[in-house]
A protein has these predicted regions:
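Catalytic cores of nucleotide-sugar-dependent glycosyltransferases that transfer UDP/GDP/TDP-activated
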Residues: 1-172
Length: 172
């Protein structure tokens, strides 16, 4: 099967627990395709009158694309998007890229960006130290958080359970 020029390769990772270095590009492509699918699959009869359900950071661009690209262009004007979080530890944090890289206008940038004192972005291939202690060098680093952007643009934000909602909302 051929998937966007990737013949015979695994689209989301080489093996369980390991990310591709370009996952943000892959998932941006996935999110654009997810939005365009209902209108393209005319035999289903949905057109643009749909509710999208985005799950975790991997699909967090869906509500962003919907609000920043599609609706301003007069497309999917009735569509809604619910954003569901399954594990808040995985937020899709990356070093910033130009918004155009993901097919988004520059005006979307503020929804993604945050600053912290860590010189790294931690993920499965670059985990934080076990003791949770990192050295601060006194600098501030700008980063992007896809889950944050998804939450800011979703029509409804959900968690997998009422208890999980309470757990992630607590300061403990």
């Amino acid at each position: 099967a051929k998937v966007w020029g990737k013949t015979g390769s695994k689209l989301y990772g080489e093996k369980s627990g390991h990310d591709f270095a370009d996952n943000q590009d892959r998932f941006a492509m996935f999110c654009h395709a997810a939005i365009k699918a209902p209108a393209a699959l005319t035999e289903l009869g949905f057109g643009e009158d749909v509710v999208f359900v985005a799950n975790d950071w991997h699909s967090a661009l869906v509500p962003v694309i919907l609000n920043k690209v599609m609706k301003p262009a007069g497309q999917f004007t009735k569509a809604k998007c619910a954003m569901t979080i399954h594990n808040i530890a995985f937020q899709g944090r990356f070093f910033p890229q130009p918004m155009a890289t993901y097919g988004l206008p520059d005006s979307a940038a503020d929804d993604f960006f945050f600053e912290d004192g860590y010189s790294k972005v931690y993920d499965e291939t670059n985990p934080a130290k076990e003791d949770g202690k990192e050295e601060f060098d006194g600098k501030i680093y700008r980063k992007a958080n896809w889950l944050k952007a998804g939450f800011m643009n979703a029509d409804k934000n959900l968690t997998v359970s009422e208890n999980y909602a309470k757990e992630i909302a607590s300061s403990k």
